[in-house]
Swiss-Prot record:
Residues 7-101 bind DNA. Transmembrane segments: none annotated. Signal peptide: none annotated. One of its GO terms (cellular component) is nucleus. The keyword 4Fe-4S does not apply. It holds the Pfam family B3. It is found in: Nucleus. PANTHER family: TF-B3 DOMAIN-CONTAINING PROTEIN, TRANSCRIPTION FACTOR B3-DOMAIN FAMILY-RELATED. This is B3 domain-containing protein At1g08985. It comes from the Eukaryota. SMART domains: B3 (SM01019). It comes from Arabidopsis thaliana (Mouse-ear cress).
Length: 101
């Protein structure tokens, strides 16, 4: 696995709130964008997150502060019963993120 394609994140209270947003590290997302050549328009891009055999479609968006996953994040968060302090990994492979803990 290429570590440049991996996002490791300790979930914050904000990530687990009912705002349904997962804030992502800007440098990691920009590295993936550069490596893949797939731009992230301001209104976002649909991205698949594969969690074992479950697939979640989420909206990866850019804001003035960085990047976040919006629509779809709440479903994955609730399905995995994620809470603040949990460490998650998102590995970009081909055209999707592979989720792990």
């Amino acid at each position: 696995m290429d570590p440049n394609m991996m996002i490791v994140k300790t979930l914050s209270e904000t990530d687990c709130s009912h705002d349904n947003k997962l804030i992502l590290p800007r440098d990691k997302v920009e590295n993936i964008v550069r490596s893949t050549g797939v731009p992230v328009p301001r209104m976002g891009i649909q991205v698949e997150i594969l969690d074992n055999t479950n697939s979640y479609w989420v909206n990866l968006r850019q804001s003035q502060r960085g990047y976040f996953i919006g629509r779809g994040w709440g479903e994955l968060r609730d399905a995995r019963n994620l809470k603040a302090g949990d460490v998650i990994k998102l590995y970009w492979q081909n055209t999707k993120f592979i989720f792990s803990m």
